[in-house]
Design a protein with these regions (language model features):
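Extracellular/surface-exposed low-complexity repeats and stalk/linker segments enriched in Gly/Pro
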Residues: 1-29, 33-37, 177-181
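C-terminal, surface-exposed recognition/capping segments
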Residues: 38-235
Length: 235
């Protein structure tokens, strides 16, 4: 882990930053250096790759993925950790299909995820977050969509999203299916969570993008189900 030191001379300031092993020679002046008992630092993270389509910057990979064709990790809506199974019994906000969730319900009136419950934001930092329903809609309006069973000879099926005005701008959403007691429908169905809850008065459900073959739907799956996450970079 690299460490950074600022050297302060009487009337000016010298700074040196590097991620590599290096040595520095300071000007021939006297200086003093205050060293605190504790040093707090934020790691320098490389920028996450993205493609800009329809005025929004979309990550090229899912949360937990190592490549665009990797499905990555599955998360229940509003949860920030993976699990061995996804059910109402172990859902973070509790409840069941009839309601009773402790947050994002008809009482608190919250209509989108708080950042503390947004795994994209917590994983990537900065302005990264889970997209809203409207942002996914804008993406699809600005692009053409094509189902493929073998994206770029990878053997992975999913949805290819190509910018209507620049066909070099392409997103691929792997068809990762869904996760309950196990993973189902990989390669045939894709689900991706929005940050928006569903229709008012139905707090047990949340909006998601759903695609299979040539069809694109917008169902309201149960919030406990595990889906992949495709982040967006906010302003």
């Amino acid at each position: 882990m690299s460490k950074y030191i600022k050297l302060f001379e009487t009337h000016s300031q010298y700074e040196a930053y590097t991620a590599d092993t290096a040595s520095f020679i300071t000007p021939n002046v006297s200086f003093c250096m205050d060293v605190p008992n504790e040093v707090h630092y934020n790691p320098l993270l490389p920028p996450h790759p993205y493609v800009e389509i329809g005025g929004h910057k979309w990550a090229t990979m899912n949360i937990g993925a190592s490549s665009p064709t990797d499905i990555g990790l599955y998360f229940a809506w509003g949860e920030t950790e993976t699990k061995e199974s996804y059910t109402w019994d172990n859902y973070k906000f509790g409840g069941n299909a009839s309601g009773g969730q402790s947050k994002y319900n008809n009482t608190d009136g919250k209509r989108t995820l708080d950042l503390e419950d947004d795994v994209a934001h917590l994983t990537l930092g900065g302005n990264w977050r889970i997209p809203t329903q409207n942002e996914f809609a804008a993406l699809l309006q600005s692009a053409t969509t094509t189902w493929t069973s073998n994206y770029m000879d990878s053997g992975v099926a999913g949805l290819v999203i190509t910018d209507k005005t620049d066909n070099t701008k392409v997103l691929f959403l792997p068809a990762g299916g869904f996760y309950e007691y196990g993973i189902h429908n990989v390669g045939t169905i894709g689900y991706y969570w929005y940050s928006s809850p569903t229709v008012e008065n139905y707090p047990a459900f949340a909006y998601a993008l759903n695609f299979q073959n040539g069809s694109i739907l917008e169902p309201g799956p149960k919030r406990f189900e595990g889906f992949p996450i495709r982040p967006i970079l906010g302003e």
